[in-house]
Design a protein with these regions (language model features):
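Hydrophobic anchor at the beta1->P-loop junction of P-loop NTPases
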Residues: 53
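N-terminal chloroplast transit peptides
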Residues: 1-20
């Protein structure tokens, strides 16, 4: 009887790099599409209300702001970029030439202009919370604080370049961040929402993850009946009463 050798197993086909790349791109596209849909849904609930990102230096407000605006279909504005566009000087240059007080005055003027717009994600400077009058403008929208561990923020700032940060010139980065946080913490806590960056690695959570966290927090916030009513309802007759005991406003219409 003739023995038959078993048929050789088929050799597995090798997966080309181009195929792997296509699969990865498809997965990324699906994730981006899902984030886009969720972002637009949150934007619809906000009914035009702008989002202001606040936080200490190194929290990635500019990068996160641009990505969040894209997901929501909003326009992205950056107060530092607007200041540079108007003055033709960087914030660091203005700090050096004018001092912090004058810089904050310029920053407040820019914020007052920006706060008049709707459907915007606004990335703000780290110290914008220091001026009490700025909160009147910040409260025109939803304020989201980005928060991370000091060591993570220091690594980001060092990677970006200390020379861009006028308040870091005189001492170590971590020590300075700690002092700034100590001075500003009570103001940052006034934010409507706080979103953690995470510290799983040196870079913190990826931008897409941070965007998901922001959208989730915004969705939960605006879904509350009281907040939704506040955002949507306009004043009705009788909601606002104007008193004029001295008659300085003149006769009433149709009087």
């Amino acid at each position: 009887m003739r023995a038959f050798a078993p048929a050789p197993c088929a050799r597995p086909r090798s997966v080309s790099r181009s195929t792997t790349r296509r699969v990865a791109l498809a997965a990324a596209a699906d994730a981006t599409s899902a984030q886009y849909l969720r972002g637009r849904a949150v934007a619809d609930k906000l009914v035009g209300t702008s989002v202001f990102l606040i936080g200490i230096m190194g929290t990635g407000k500019s990068t996160v702001g641009a990505a969040l605006a894209k997901a929501m279909g909003y326009k992205h504005l950056d107060t530092d970029e607007l200041i540079q566009g108007v003055t033709k000087k960087t914030p660091a240059e203005l700090f050096a030439e004018l001092g912090e007080s004058e810089f904050r005055a310029i920053e407040s003027l820019i914020l007052a202009e920006v706060a008049a717009y709707k459907n915007c994600v606004v990335s703000t400077g780290g110290g914008i919370v220091c001026e009490r009058t700025n909160w009147m403008h910040l409260h025109n929208g939803v304020t989201v604080r980005l928060h991370g561990e000091n060591e993570l923020l220091a690594k980001r700032v060092l990677a970006d370049g200390v020379e861009k940060r006028p308040l870091l010139a005189s001492e170590g980065v971590v020590a300075r961040i700690e002092k700034l946080l100590e001075a500003r913490e009570s103001m940052y806590k006034q934010a409507d929402l706080t979103v953690p960056l995470g510290s799983r690695d040196d870079a913190g959570a990826p931008v897409d993850v941070v965007i998901d966290r922001i959208l989730e927090a915004l969705d939960a916030r605006v879904s509350e009946d009281a907040v939704q009513s506040k955002l949507k309802n306009e004043p009705k007759d009788g909601d606002i009463t104007v008193t004029d005991p001295r008659g300085e406003l003149g006769p009433k219409p149709n009087a």
